[in-house]
Amino acid sequence: MRIAFLSRHFDPQGGGAERYSVAVAEELAQRHEVHVFAQTFGSSPPNGWTPHKIPGPLRRPRWVNQLWFALTTAWLTHRGFDVVYSHEHSWHGNVQCFHVLPIRYSLLKNRHGWRKALRILKILTSPRLLAYWWLEGARLKGVANGQRAVLAVSEPLRMTLEQTYPVAKGKVHVITPGVSSAVPKSAQDQVSARAALGLPLQARLALLVANDPLRKGLKTLIHALGLLPPEWKLVIAGHIPAASAYCALAEDAGVLERLLFIGPQQDLRWAYHAADVLTHPTLEDTYGMVVLEAMANGLPVVVSDLPYCGISAELSHGSQALVLQDPTDAPELAQALQTLVDQPERMQQLATLGHAWAGQKTWSQCARAHEAVFEQVTANRR
């Protein structure tokens, strides 16, 4: 098949959506002709796929750039491709992948009566919100008759999509992320990784991977850190805008010197190998790829429960992970982390069971599931 990928930022150092699209494209490129249309690409050279850079004359406001990207890619890919696979808000693309909660759901949830009326008025008077509202609805056009397929990266996201858009009920395919490899770290791996990243060799290191740390639970982690012994440090990996704001929060809590920023990582395995535990007290994640990746590297995980994190729909508390009922509860988080120190056998059990579970979810399987959907869509067009 000749496949076009639409993704504004095609970079494995981006968030989960970006890493998902890159991994699937690289897997599919082994068997198909894959073309990627994006405004920015990562530093790594193309791995079997052909890049097409889309100019961005107006990167701000973002909604105008979104319309520009949709219009440009629609013109470039309207013919010559069996599948146009969009990870963006666009009316074009016979396969649409949703990575985040629907805008319509987020704007109107828990709003009734006059509060709902006021929100609708706000939408109607905002070009930005109207653009996103329309673009999102356009992604579902044709799904009822099989001319278009819709994918969700988790079962909870599928349920929310079908609740928000009844036309998609029973039509959304769930294809969860995978991992490239599942090799547990060794003690020597941890020593080497800490040395390479300039991290202390003897400390207890909790890891947070995030480009939006506050939404991923940094505030709770900072307060939890203050409840833990001084040996605990928090390693933060990712693009951290306005780091001073987070430092001020940590300084107020008396833990500033225990925050270790290592920035974005080309290969997160170094960070996973260096840490003792992954902490993911996220406030909103439709899946949580970093949780799966950490497990694949043999790292025990503390993660938010539903409805905060989609991957928790597949996990059992105390088996593959420690699951937090309330991601804003710092004492609960601190207790979970200290439990791993006080009960090393439980820590090892979590790492072992989590690793075994993650090893069953590969990018190869994910790509095969995509192929099945692509074949179904192309067959419906004949």
Predicted features by range, described:
Residues 19-23, 204-227, 241-244, 369:
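A conserved mid-protein helix/loop that constitutes part of the nucleotide-sugar donor-binding site
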Residues 41, 179-180, 209-211, 233-247:
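Glycosyltransferase donor-sugar binding loop
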Residues 121-153, 159, 164-165:
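Membrane-proximal helix-turn-helix segments that form the acceptor-binding/catalytic region
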Residues 162, 171, 178-196, 381:
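Acidic anion/phosphate-binding donor-loop and adjacent secondary structure
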Residues 192-195, 339, 346-360, 372:
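A short, well-ordered alpha-helix in the C-terminal region of glycosyltransferases
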Residues 264, 283:
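Aromatic "clamp/platform" in nucleotide-sugar-dependent glycosyltransferases that forms part
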Residues 300-310:
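Short hydrophobic beta-strand element within catalytic cores of glycosyltransferases
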